[in-house]
């Protein structure tokens, strides 16, 4: 979060040949160019969803205060990948469920140990921000049970709708970080601008406040 207020740099989609601004509006204000796909559920016998063993505490164990969104500082998390190779950089995205505030961390690779280490660094920097995080059940998050200072839960495998808030924000980020494009050249400043475009947007679901405005209210109270 930029304590100096909204970033004044102009934003362009990541598929442009340069990170430099060419338009007077941010890409987040344009209609989303996302392909909507139906949720694909994997079914076993009897039509029930087929689930692998969870990596740790299941989403089913989350307390009710997380489900109703009335209590802030509970998050959903995942990775946004450019090139799908573990030795390639990616983005770890964390979305606060009540305010929709987004934290984005560039990671040099998405090995489980790397994801755990950099998330722990973020929690250690902002210990008051994080009560819980719910991740998907991907192998990248296998070491998250080692996290200290924050409760970790795991959604069921093949169930992205269980982290719908984070999935929605990841869709917005995809306007700046398209699939198949390496993130090696994406600078910290560019990632911050893309994140600010989401956090500074007035949203109907937030009564036309911004995610950053609401998040600041909660952490300062």
Where are these regions (language model features)?
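Acidic/histidine-rich, metal-coordinating catalytic segments
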Residues: 128-143, 158
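Mobile genetic element proteins and their domesticated derivatives, centered on retroelements
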Residues: 1, 14, 78, 100, ...
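Short conserved beta-strand segments at catalytic cores or DNA/RNA-binding microdomains
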Residues: 67, 80, 87-103
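Short small-residue beta-strand/loop micro-motif enriched in glycine and branched aliphatics
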Residues: 100-105, 154, 179
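Two-metal-ion RNase H-like nuclease active-site motif
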Residues: 72-83
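Charged alpha-helix within mobile-element recombinases
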Residues: 124, 146-152, 158-221
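Basic, flexible linker segments flanking DNA-binding modules
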Residues: 6-67
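Active-site beta-loop-alpha junctions of metal-dependent nucleic acid enzymes
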Residues: 81-83, 87, 104-128
């Amino acid at each position: 979060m930029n304590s100096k207020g909204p970033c004044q740099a102009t934003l362009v989609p990541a598929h442009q040949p340069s990170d430099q601004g060419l338009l007077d509006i941010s890409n987040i204000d344009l209609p989303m160019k996302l392909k909507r796909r139906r949720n694909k559920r994997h079914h076993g016998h009897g039509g029930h969803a087929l689930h692998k063993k969870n990596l740790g505490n299941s989403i089913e164990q989350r307390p009710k205060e997380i489900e109703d969104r009335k209590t802030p500082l509970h998050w959903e998390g995942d990775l946004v990948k450019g090139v799908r190779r573990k030795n390639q950089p990616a983005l770890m995205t964390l979305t606060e469920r009540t305010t929709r505030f987004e934290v984005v961390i560039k990671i040099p690779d998405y090995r489980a140990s790397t994801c755990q280490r950099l998330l722990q660094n973020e929690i250690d920097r902002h210990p008051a921000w994080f009560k819980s995080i719910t991740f998907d059940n991907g192998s990248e998050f296998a070491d998250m049970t080692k996290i200290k200072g924050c409760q970790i839960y795991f959604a069921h495998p093949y169930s992205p709708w269980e982290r719908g808030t984070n999935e929605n924000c990841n869709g917005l980020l995809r306007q700046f970080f398209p699939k198949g494009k390496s993130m090696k050249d994406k600078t910290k400043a560019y990632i911050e601008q893309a994140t600010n475009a989401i956090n500074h947007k007035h949203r109907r679901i937030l009564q036309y406040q911004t995610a950053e405005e609401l998040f600041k209210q909660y952490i300062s109270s």
